[in-house]
Amino acid sequence: MHVAVALLQAGQRVATIDLDSRQKSFSHYVENRRCWVERSGLKLDLPTHYCVARGFGLRLDEIEAQEFAAFAEAISAIEQTHDFIVIDTPGSDSYLMRLAHSMADTLITPLNDSFVDFDVLGMIDQNTFEVTGVSHYADMVREARRQRRLVDGGLTDWIVVRNRLSTLSSRNKRLVGEGVEGLAKQLGFRAVDGFAERVVYREFFPRGLTALDHLNEDTLGGRPSTSHITARDEVRLLIDALRLPIDERGKRRAAARAEWIAAAAKPLETHDLLAD
């Protein structure tokens, strides 16, 4: 959600697709934001959103065909009219999850800062904590990137984002970091620090807010704290690290929109009210 809002604020036309039709966390986040806009009257950027429904049938091929048709319909509706499509995939393996990975220009894999989450990427030696092998998810991504190269010669920029980072140094934090860096060299992804463990991120969800929104008493229901400001800086650093291809046309749209909003917020001068 933070990536989508960052792109919207940069003047990009953004669509979002939720492939996790069981949990629907992404869809609920967008819907919460939409409802808060309607209830509060605030001007918050909203993406064009789609949620691909689960397929039903007796055979796996029937289910996959239904889901592919729904996904293809969503892509066809937005690919010519939007600059970015942000897709949320389920944690479980599925046909659409693999397809989305193989289509991605930028793949962001969030990883909680623990060896429990690290296990989906690689295996480690119990004594030395050195990486000894590649796990199932990393294998799947490697195959998806290979398929992408075969189709159009494109190279997926794979970024592993370490989330829920402790603000304090610890042996676990150091060892996980060393493991991620080791795998980055082996698998060809970029490792970047993401979000620290902050309560404010969980507080944003009910209203669909992000750390990049203009946070005040109207949006939050209270004054922003130092933690809110720190979270905003943290998100901006992450967005910069992603190196998303934001074009100049989008930047001009964002500047024009900001100028219009600033002008709309100012009271009219006397000479604007009276005709010559």
Descriptions of predicted regions:
Residues E67, D117-L121, A231-V235:
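Phosphate/oxyanion-binding active-site loops and adjacent basic polyanion-contact surfaces
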Residues M1, F68-A72, V235, I239:
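Short, well-ordered alpha-helical scaffold segments within catalytic/effector domains
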